């Protein structure tokens, strides 16, 4: 059986898919607690203009966040705090997923 992420990738890279609409549909399903993998996760950007910024993004992992430009991304600290944009802004910024509470505590200081 395919995971939600595998299903998304299969559909996204199908030739007749309207890519931005597919991402929007998966985000809507996540908001309704149907697809938990697409619920917003916290990432920290390590490179580029946004180095050190933490963001919330609906991408299920950092690889897809860099590869697909249509995920919703919101800056949660730094000079861009509150800015809601698409994951295209984080292209080539090497995001990493903040999973553990201990990491979140380190960044809050």
From Swiss-Prot:
It comes from the Viruses. This is Uncharacterized 12.8 kDa protein in regB-denV intergenic region. The lineage of its organism: Viruses, Duplodnaviria, Heunggongvirae, Uroviricota, Caudoviricetes.
């Amino acid at each position: 059986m395919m995971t939600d992420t595998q299903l998304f990738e299969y559909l996204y890279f199908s030739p007749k898919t309207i890519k931005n609409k597919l991402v929007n549909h998966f985000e809507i399903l996540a908001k309704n607690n149907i697809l938990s993998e697409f619920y917003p996760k916290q990432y920290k950007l390590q490179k580029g203009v946004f180095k050190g910024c933490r963001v919330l993004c609906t991408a299920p992992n950092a690889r897809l966040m860099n590869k697909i430009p249509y995920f919703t991304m919101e800056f949660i600290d730094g000079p861009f705090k509150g800015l809601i944009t698409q994951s295209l802004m984080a292209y080539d910024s090497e995001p990493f997923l903040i999973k553990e509470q201990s990491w979140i505590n380190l960044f809050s200081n």
